[in-house]
């Protein structure tokens, strides 16, 4: 079982799945055992409840769904899961290492 679970939520998932791959590589390169996955924003309630996938230790929203931050932040707080929006620059440049570092900062 992974040490930490990092969930990303986005609108559709294609570009976010590429970012997940880059985050997984950055974690592996640093000897970290993280489960990192992406799902649609429609799955946020299930993710926060740990239904259908492990409950995340942190939830990151893709910048294209940043407008949902207020609504999701309330749900995440109730679930005890820190969350934030991925920086547009890091998302656009697919900087998996930077997004991973942001997730780690939220978990600490």
Swiss-Prot record:
GO terms for biological process: phosphoenolpyruvate-dependent sugar phosphotransferase system. GO terms for molecular function: kinase activity; protein-N(PI)-phosphohistidine-sugar phosphotransferase activity. InterPro entries: PTS_EIIB-like_sf, PTS_EIIB_2/3, PTS_EIIB_3, PTS_sugar-specific_EIIB. Keywords: Kinase, Phosphoprotein, Phosphotransferase system, Sugar transport, Transferase, Transport. The modification Phosphocysteine is found at residue 10. Residues 3-108 form the PTS EIIB type-3 domain. PANTHER family: PTS SYSTEM N,N'-DIACETYLCHITOBIOSE-SPECIFIC EIIB COMPONENT. The PTS EIIB type-3 domain is phosphorylated by phospho-EIIA on a cysteinyl residue. Then, it transfers the phosphoryl group to the sugar substrate concomitantly with the sugar uptake processed by the PTS EIIC type-3 domain. This is PTS system cellobiose-specific EIIB component. It comes from Lactococcus lactis subsp. lactis (strain IL1403) (Streptococcus lactis). The gene is ptcB.
